[in-house]
Amino acid sequence: VLVLGDSITQDGRYVSYLEYYLQRFAPNTHSDLISIGLSSETLSGLTEPDHPAPRPCLFDRLDRALELVKPQVVLACYGMNDGIYHPSSPERLAAFTHGLSRLIEKVHAIGAQLVLITPPVFDARPISARTVSDTAPEFGYKHPYNNYDDVLVEFAAAEIAQQAPKIRVIDLHQAMRAALTAARVLDPAFTFSPDGVHPNEAGHLLMARTLATGLGLALPEMTAAVELPALAADPRFTLIRDRRALRSEAWLPYIGYTNGKTYHSASVAATERVVARLQAEIAIASAK
């Protein structure tokens, strides 16, 4: 399984939780994840004027990633950066939709199944001092449009419209938006994203639970306040998290990318030997 995305995926916490759920609740699937999220990346190829360097575009590295990983399944979570924090526009929506079409074409060309994940929620409330209205002269990550989440609703709808054989869409955005609305009934200051964009620990956990259930797993009902300490105390999760992080750190430059500078490494062989050892330890921990 190849996992693609932006900085939220590069952070990797939701991927670690998802891999834990897959290994614990669907062990017979033998899921093997390689996660290569890249900060600032888009499907649309767009960059806002105040961004320090051109945003990386997935298609600069996708062919090499598919060739080296040879995935049977590809998970892709994009959209947060694709509207470049501007108000809605037909041009930016078209650029995102075109990126979706290119991704679908390339994944299907190698015979893999694609799982599109709609973007996490954008939360303007905790960063209201630096958001701007639709009449502002400029927009970007530093000063995003205050109703940018409505743009993400449009992007999510564009992804949902792609649902077809060999294309599954998991509507993460709606799940996070509903959970945020419900939580704010009790606590108006509640947020999953303290900086408006990047989910906190509870946000990553909700992402993973939403993806796991969207993939057909049956998870026990549990609040984040109960589940997060339980996961931290589970040696299986610690091993899975460390394995995921080690693998991501090695495979990202092995595939190669440009984000201001260009990065490329020659091999992941040494890392994969450590990954195999960690997986053996995970199997032992799971048998206890």
Spans of features found by a protein language model:
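The substrate-binding groove and active-site-proximal loops of carbohydrate-active enzymes
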Residues: 51-52, 83-97, 141-151, 198
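Conserved catalytic region of serine esterases and O-acyltransferases that act on ester linkages
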Residues: 165-170, 177-179, 184-288
